[in-house]
């Protein structure tokens, strides 16, 4: 029940943990750093998977599965890549009762094991592009964990593609980060900033990393998806060449891109409240709960409730009736608010007599009456669409209110405690590191989209807030998960 949840104003971190556990989304596992994703949480992941998988296939990608274990010799082939992941790797040294001749790494990401296969599959330009996605689990040995946001084992998808030219690879990188942006905004109702990572924040082994960044209700940033231009690094490491139209041999060009179950954490922290989970209808497994008020003619009320649920289901709206009598309607209201059901429909004998019923929105808690007539399904669908759009609009307004521009370091240190800060940076790793050391804020994104850049004057030259040196552009700083 919602009374188990610490308020956001009292302790935001504890609120998040309380909500995840009270709504039965996930729980701590007996294995340190791992979590159990409970059915309510996994149902959200399945909705995310279904939408993303469809979007991947619409852009020409197919699914495959590669081994969990990666030979040490493969990992060592890409020096920058392994250097970036070495501290997080889990290593298998024994199997079958004896020490292994070669250590096996439990995948932290799959570039190396996948490129060992791509070398065998790619011979000619006719084999390109190769567009493969994998749904899998990965292991990164995290020291400080938080349910969904950072765990030792987590679920994700990772796309790995091979191309004949760098231009094609760059197009793929941008195509897929835009797929993620569309998913975040149209399904998660989560506004995101699309752009590039700084060199110190990019993926290990990448030429460039593009990302989408979202703001949580505490003003912190959360990286919601990444897409990497890997250049020819992995092709060279695995000697993956193809014969061109001109009969010459060239190394292929590579990309990788991925999102994970941390999106569930983002969904929770962006929209939920002190009563519990708030889900956008497009990611809610159950969109409408019908609660009969069982007074008077129970049979008639239940008959009407079942008919409404059937009509909604036929129209593609996920609806169900809670006709149990062991709990009061008030208890049910609170329970389904905790679970984040987007819309509640209350139906009693008086409602049936008057030809009207009460519907309550989860996002705003607003109650309205709608007619029990042949427009009911259309009315419910319109309300669900309104909820989806209103949740996005509310999150966008919040981000705008918590985004400030500063021109000096003193103002920066105050502003970065509350949200996103747009400021000039001199482009050096040294300045970036100093700011991170002193404030714990990092450069989240170098925005690329025209609308955002125009709104905040991102591409206007100026002076770095920290060093006082010339700056070619502004960037977005924030503390982050």
From Swiss-Prot:
Q: EC number(s) in its UniProt entry?
A: 6.1.1.15
Spell out the protein name for this chain: Proline--tRNA ligase
User: What GO molecular function annotations does the UniProt record carry, in alphabetical order?
Assistant: ATP binding; proline-tRNA ligase activity
Which InterPro entries does this UniProt record tie to the protein? aa-tRNA-synt_IIb, aa-tRNA-synth_II, aa-tRNA-synth_II/BPL/LPL, Anticodon-bd, Anticodon-bd_dom_sf, Pro-tRNA-ligase_IIa, Pro-tRNA-ligase_IIa_arc-type, Pro-tRNA_ligase_II_C
Assembly, per entry: Homodimer.
PROSITE patterns given in the database record: AA_TRNA_LIGASE_II
Primary subcellular site in the record, as a coarse category: cytoplasm
């Amino acid at each position: 029940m919602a009374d188990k949840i610490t308020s956001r104003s009292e302790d935001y971190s504890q609120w998040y943990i309380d909500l995840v556990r009270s709504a039965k989304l996930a729980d701590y596992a007996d294995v340190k750093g791992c979590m159990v994703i409970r059915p309510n949480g996994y149902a959200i992941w399945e909705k995310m998977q279904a939408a993303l998988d469809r979007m991947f296939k619409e852009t020409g990608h197919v699914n495959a599965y590669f081994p969990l274990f990666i030979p040490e010799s493969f990992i060592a082939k890409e020096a920058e890549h392994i250097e970036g992941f070495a501290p997080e790797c889990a290593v298998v040294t024994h199997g079958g009762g004896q020490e292994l001749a070669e250590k096996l790494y439990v995948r932290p990401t799959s570039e190396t094991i996948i490129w060992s296969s791509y070398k065998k599959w790619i011979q000619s330009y006719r084999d390109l592009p190769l567009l493969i996605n994998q749904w899998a689990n990965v292991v990164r040995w995290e020291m400080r964990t938080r349910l969904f946001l950072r765990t030792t084992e987590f679920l994700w998808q990772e796309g790995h593609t091979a191309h004949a030219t760098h231009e094609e690879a760059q197009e793929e990188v941008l195509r897929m980060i835009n797929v993620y942006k569309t998913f975040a905004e149209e399904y998660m109702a989560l506004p995101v900033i699309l752009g590039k990572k700084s060199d110190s924040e990019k993926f290990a082994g990448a030429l460039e990393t593009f990302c989408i960044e979202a703001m949580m209700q505490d003003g912190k940033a959360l990286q919601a998806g990444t897409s990497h231009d890997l250049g020819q690094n992995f092709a060279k490491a695995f000697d993956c060449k193809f014969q061109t139209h001109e009969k010459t041999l060239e190394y292929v060009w590579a990309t990788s891109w991925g999102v994970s179950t941390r999106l569930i954490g983002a969904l929770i922290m962006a929209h939920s409240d002190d009563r519990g989970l708030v889900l956008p209808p497009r990611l809610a497994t159950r969109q409408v709960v019908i609660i009969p008020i069982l007074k008077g003619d129970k049979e008639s009320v239940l008959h009407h409730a079942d008919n409404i649920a059937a009509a909604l289901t036929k129209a593609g709206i996920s609806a169900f009736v809670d006709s149990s009598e062991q709990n009061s309607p008030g208890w049910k209201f609170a329970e389904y608010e905790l679970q984040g059901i987007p819309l509640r429909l209350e139906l009693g004998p008086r409602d049936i007599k008057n030809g009207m019923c009460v519907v309550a929105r989860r996002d705003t808690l607003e109650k309205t009456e709608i007619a029990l007539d042949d427009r009911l399904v259309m009315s419910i669908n319109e309300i669900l669409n309104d909820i989806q759009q209103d949740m996005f609009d509310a999150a966008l307004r919040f981000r705008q209110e918590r985004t400030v521009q500063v021109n000096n370091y003193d103002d920066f240190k105050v502003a970065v405690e509350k949200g996103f800060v747009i400021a000039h940076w001199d482009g050096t790793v040294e300045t970036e590191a100093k700011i991170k050391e002193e404030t714990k804020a990092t450069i989240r994104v170098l925005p690329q989209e025209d609308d955002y850049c125009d709104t905040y004057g991102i591409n206007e030259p100026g002076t770095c807030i920290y060093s006082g040196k010339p700056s070619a552009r502004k960037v977005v700083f924030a503390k982050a998960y």
